[in-house]
Amino acid sequence: MGISFTVLSSGSTGNVTVVRNGETTLMIDAGLSAKRIDELLAMRELTGTDLDGILVTHEHSDHIKGLGAMARKYDLPIYANQNTWGAIEKGIGKIAEHNKIILETGQHRDFGSMRVESFAISHDAAEPVAYNFYDGKEKLCVATDLGYVSDKVKAAISDADVLVLESNHDIEMLRMGRYPWNTKRRILGDLGHLSNEAAGAALSEILTGRTKRAYLAHLSRDHNMMDLAKMSVRGAMEDRGCFYKDSEFRLCDTYYDRPTPWDKVSQS
């Protein structure tokens, strides 16, 4: 059947993505209330009972707000590295011991024919990760909350059929915005979030003929807009000599208030 996915919600207020392959259905993060996650799942004809587990990227509230409630309600295993478990355990409430699963950074785990592999990213959290999903020859990468894209991250995200990649802010909108300077400095720093320009620069370096789509994710509601993000990302790519036709590669939207359509990774 191959990999398909939907980004249920993406942004500074909450992040939830679902990846499935016919045998297994996994959720990445649970950054909204359990009630809201259930509503978004229903929009894609799913319920919590369809889920086989939750993969955690890091401990910030916009990624774990509903984590404990979802795990308890549906008896779901939670997969996270040891340091992330240490950062989330007190805040998410009681979790059954059999649902506390350690997946260390760089390790992989097979769920039937789908392999999940985590890799380290740069963010101001205990031990943040992003995830690659493999099934046969298919590869999906989900990577947000990056201060910058290191050479190791470029290697990890390259050659994906589809990417979900952070494009958090427009630098000038952030600089002129209402946040205090220490918050702006954190967002702009190497442990912060990826700007539109940085996302475009990264794509220009890793894009191959195999990669058909990139979903721009984790957009700031205060310091970005989807049309601006797509224009800036494409401009940054073209500035670096990376030109493409829409028939070859597309930049796709994500939303904070509704899910993206199901997307089959293998579609042309």
Where in this protein do the model-derived segments appear?
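Conserved beta-strand hairpin/beta-sheet module of binuclear metal-dependent hydrolase folds
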Residues: 1-44, 127-145, 162
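Structured catalytic core of nucleotide-sugar glycosyltransferases
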Residues: 6-16, 58-63, 89, 116-118
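Active-site neighborhood of phospho(di)ester-bond hydrolases with catalytic His/Asp-centered motifs
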Residues: 28-31, 51-59, 79-82, 141-144, ...
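Active-site metal-binding motif and surrounding structural segment of the metallo-beta-lactamase
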Residues: 35-81
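Active-site environment of divalent metal-dependent phosphoester hydrolases
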Residues: 60-64, 85-87, 126, 148-151, ...
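Metal-dependent catalytic neighborhoods of phosphoester/phosphodiester hydrolases
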Residues: 65-74, 89-91, 224-231
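Cap/insert and terminal regions of metallo-dependent hydrolase folds
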Residues: 151-252
